[in-house]
Amino acid sequence: MTNFEELKWRGLIKDTAGEDIEEKINKGDITFYWGTDPTADSLHLGHYSSLVTAKRLAKMGNHPILLVGGATGLIGDPRPTAEREIISKEAVESNLEGIKKQVERLFDGNVEVVNNYDWIKNFNFIDFLRDVGKYINVNYMLDKDIIRRRLSTGITFAEFSYTLIQGYDFLHLYKNKNCIMQAAGSDQWGNITTGVDLIKKMTGEEAYAFTMPLVLDKYGRKFGKSEGNALWLDRNKTTSYEIYQYLINVDDELVIDYLKIFTFLSKEEIEVLDEENKNHPEMRNAHKILAREIITDLHGKEAYEEAVEISKSLFKGDIKKLNANEIETAFKGLTPYQITEEKNIVDLLTEADICKSKREAREFITNGSITLNGEKIENIDFLVNKNVAIEQKYVVIRRGKKKYYIIKF
């Protein structure tokens, strides 16, 4: 396959700009950019498809630039339905540094990170209108999907101007970095074409761009959302275990598509996994390899192996194999019930709201529905103290088959 054919096979090409873009990508040795606004101090799994595509283009012999929008982040990309909240300058600067470090680590330093505030700050309002606004027709902007959808509910001038700044970013990089191509998610097509058209009008030369389809789950939600919350790339915000659980449970019908998008496995390797997934879906080999490739890339091999071990221990109910740090990782979403002294199991189950009453607690114990650190408790006089806690700190209580509670000394 040619470079462009591989991108198409992996489902990474939706819209394109530039007549000979296929030839440019196949030839390689071009400078391209991908941009994001620093709306948080970490990127999330939804951004990861674009990052992997940028890494893929780099492996094809091209030169990546990541633009972090210190200027555009102060305004906010127009949403389809409502205005974004304005972020403070201090938050934008802090977020920008966090994202920069994250991206440089993912690319092993082989990426240039730029901040559009560095060149936008030098514009005064009149100069921007003369040098940029003069070349963009209002009717042209009104025809863009995101603008058109907001007209009925109202759109601020700041949001309306966002596409001008992003368009100028492409022009600036084109002139100063010989950056001839932009890659982005398909929701950015309107902003991308502004840049392509601006370059054409101001230089008479052609620029190139392509968009990637947004990665969705089977319900049409953006990939990387777990119960409405983003799965962050920063380990301190989202653990490797949380990402592992999300990936190991993705829909069978989508796992092969995700392998194409998010991994560097070859076509032949993915086709083998496709056959295995069709013939033996219960083995979940494709899911396991998807998790292995993503987590190893994001957090390292050791973090992936730890996530696997935590998952195995919980599945087998072998809680005692986990250490205190692994307990914290595995049950990050649970608020521990804290105690400072020895407690009778019946009293503890009631006080911690694990059971509604002492009578119910005794019933759960006698019918074998309560386990403590993986071991069934059948004695209503059992005492919970530091000696039974993992590292004298944590007690994991399971009620029934799936309901977990954490007790902390």
Please give the residue ranges for each predicted region.
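NTP-dependent nucleotidyl-transfer catalytic core
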Residues: M1-Q188, T193-V196, M202-Y208, R221
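Conserved nucleotide- and phosphate/pyrophosphate-binding catalytic cores
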Residues: K201-F409
